[in-house]
């Protein structure tokens, strides 16, 4: 089903666009009855790496060609941040997102319950059409809103201002109420408005570009940052899981989940990365299943560096992040690189060398391992996911069976070799199949929408 021709309204004034919102809502109701997610993200590719980096600047500004085309990576034409395969919306690029500045000044009302959702959706209507001119857009559509979190309990530290101002708003409306009643009302108002804003934005995006994989960056969160604990396991705290369970409306409205597996600098050299990543990815699968859609694509966001540093991830850490995501059955990963990392010729050259020598071969290894496992175990109609009893298993190719070599004269890397009987048996023991939509059976060999 295609949406009505909204693209002709690209330059509608806000007021006129607002009149179309009821039509969008009606369309969304019809859309929800035919909901489906394409599995895999790229045809015949059970695990996909998406490049969300503005490395076009390396070529345009510094003459450094970061060539990722030879590594089986999906990117936008020209390696732009936003395009037909991958579009990310930051808070200033989508609608009228309410928040407080670092100085405590409100922008667009500051609080979601104190802002105009209609004005936001009218502006969002135009922003989506401008960023995604093709009605059949079928790439990743990621919304990055980080000022506040939709659960009251999650707004701590600098985000506590949203709880403080919510209480003040209720107290102003009801000066005779006691603190417990104010607290309860403030929480209800904030969480209710946060749901309306986030779910409403997703619904509008899906109405306008129904084939896009819409979702919010860094949801779900796991908050497993207690690295200094001598008994660190990486597990998400139980109270965090309980809070995530209250966000069923968000998981149910999303068309993909984008948890963050950015590696904090404190993890460097600790040997705890695998535990950290394992449970962050697992939490995404858990909430998807809890929302009734275990086949919802999970695409973790990762970086080339330890977070907030210029230290590239060594090959071992790529195995613990990229490889761990693939082993759990993720549809892929999104590789994000900040603008700052492409600001100088030296930084661009460093990225190019890292991609050529470390990242590229790792991507090819994991992508090929996932594809071969899909073909061997799942008839090519599903992706392999690690069995719970083998928490260390990876879809990493056996170095005695395969080698990765450059093509003479430049060009794509070449994977040489074949799965041995031992490799196949290991896959069968350590992994099981998660069938794509429409397929079933132990080996995903049976077609039918049952």
UniProtKB/Swiss-Prot annotation:
- Location of the protein in the cell: Secreted; Lysosome
- Which reactions is this enzyme annotated as catalysing? Random hydrolysis of (1->4)-linkages between N-acetyl-beta-D-glucosamine and D-glucuronate residues in hyaluronate
Q: Name one GO molecular function term.
A: hyalurononglucosaminidase activity
Q: Where is the EGF-like domain?
A: 433-444
Please cite one Gene Ontology biological process associated with this protein. cellular response to platelet-derived growth factor stimulus
Domain of life of the source: Eukaryota
Q: Which PROSITE patterns match?
A: EGF_1, EGF_2
The EC designation for this entry is 3.2.1.35
Q: Which residue positions does the secretion signal occupy?
A: 1-35
Q: Which residues are glycosylated?
A: 85, 231, 365, 398
| Keyword Signal listed | yes
Q: What is its main location?
A: secreted
The cross-references to Pfam families, in alphabetical order and at most eight, read: Glyco_hydro_56
Query: What job does the chain carry out?
Result: May have a role in promoting tumor progression. May block the TGFB1-enhanced cell growth.
Q: Which family does it belong to?
A: Belongs to the glycosyl hydrolase 56 family.
Protein name listed in UniProt: Hyaluronidase-1
Gene for this chain: HYAL1
